[in-house]
Amino acid sequence: MANSPSAKKRAKQAEKRRSHNASLRSMVRTYIKNVVKAIAAKDLELAKTAYTAAVPVIDRMADKGIIHKNKAARHKSRLNAHIKALGEAAAA
C-alpha cells in the first residue's frame, strides 16, 4: 500500500484511469460486436451502418492509447473485408 501522500494520490489516479479505460474498451468492443452481428445476419446495410459508426470510435480510442493503433487498423481492415465479401456474395 502507498505510504506517502503523492503515492496515495497516484494510486487513486491510476485506479480511476483504469476503470475509465475499461469502460472505453468495453464501448469499442460493443461497436465491433454490432458490426459482427450484422455480418453474421448477412444484413449488408446494417453492417455498413454499424461499421460507419464504429470506425471513428475505434480511431479515437487508438489516438487516446486505449487500444494500440495496429489493433485498431486490424479490426477496421478485417471488418471491412467481411463487409466487402458480404456485398460480393449478395451481388453474385
Curated annotation (Swiss-Prot):
Binds directly to 16S ribosomal RNA. This is Small ribosomal subunit protein bS20. It comes from the Bacteria. One of its GO terms (biological process) is translation. The keyword Ribonucleoprotein applies. GO terms for cellular component: cytosol; small ribosomal subunit. Belongs to the bacterial ribosomal protein bS20 family. Residues 1-23 are annotated as: Disordered. Residues 7-20 have a biased composition (Basic residues). One of its GO terms (molecular function) is small ribosomal subunit rRNA binding. The keyword Ribosomal protein applies. Keywords: Ribonucleoprotein, Ribosomal protein, RNA-binding, rRNA-binding. Signal peptide: none annotated. It comes from Ectopseudomonas mendocina (strain ymp) (Pseudomonas mendocina). Pfam families: Ribosomal_S20p. InterPro entries: Ribosomal_bS20, Ribosomal_bS20_sf.
